[in-house]
Swiss-Prot record:
Biased composition range(s): Gly residues: 190-199
Positions annotated as zinc finger (ZZ-type): 24-81, 83-137
Natural source organism: Arabidopsis thaliana (Mouse-ear cress)
Subunit details: Interacts with PVA12 and LTL1 at the endomembrane system.
Tissue: Expressed in gametophytes (both male and female), seedlings, hypocotyls, cotyledons, leaf primordia, leaves, sepals, flowers and roots.
Name this protein carries in UniProt: Protein VACUOLELESS GAMETOPHYTES
Induction entry: Highly activated by bacterial elicitors (e.g. flg22 and HrpZ) and fungal/oomycete elicitors (e.g. NPP1). Transiently induced by the pathogenic bacteria Pseudomonas syringae pv. tomato DC3000.
This protein's encoding gene: VLG
GO biological process, one term: response to molecule of fungal origin
Keyword terms: Endosome, Membrane, Metal-binding, Repeat, Signal, Zinc, Zinc-finger
InterPro entries: C1-like_sf, DC1, Znf_ZZ_sf
UniProt keyword annotation of Zinc-finger present: yes
Residue positions binding Zn(2+) 2: 102, 105, 122, 127
Gene3D superfamilies recorded: 3.30.60.90
Amino acid sequence: MASRPSVRHPSHNHPLRGHKAQVEDEIICSGCDLDLLGAYFKCTKSECDYFLHKSCFDLPREIRHKSHPDHPLILLYSPQNNNSTYTCDACGEYGSGFTYNCSICQYDVHVGCVSVPETMKHDEHVHPLALIYKAPCPKDHIFTCDVCDETMPHNLWLYYCQKCDYGAHLHSCVAEEEEKSKKGGRGRGGEGGSGGNGVNRGRSSANSELAAMLKAQREMEQMQIALHLEMQRAKIDKKSRKHMLKMI
């Protein structure tokens, strides 16, 4: 039986081979740090745990984005300057895999945040919300998310209705879409409701993937904080032991 052909990707030193993810696999993509869904590539070396969604494999190397019009964003396969993580300038969460980056401005965006929809319908507001890339008020004013009541940093992306001065950060809108998708992808009735057509099911699926990404990034941030605290405690314990030995 002939073996499946292998392919190369600039993010990894070894050849990759195509596979189809199973629900029970629980494997993390090395590009976006999310659970593998659908088609993916795996390193041909048995001892190498490198996995990549086909969608991450196919990401363009350079893009232009409305959030950063002055310079192109370049796809990086790991954080800059040998850092283990970066902070996304769209949602404010950590990332450790692929990022779209402007080295001139030190601007980073998750590969998932780059593709969020430009408009979003939220059940708590009558009008569609438009994606904007900073808070719609002066920096000395406080802007609060109308969904979760959290204060929103001025430099992060949000969904906003200018007519009503109603805004919600990415997490709030995406969390609602995730709940809708769990219930079968159905939105509100009447005009703009999903009604079960294929286009809205696809949009719901994409928003569900984004919600999973943001959830994974928040969990990663918590793990990194816990690891940092553990390292600090270890350093303190080591210094204490040295001090005790000097006293003996």
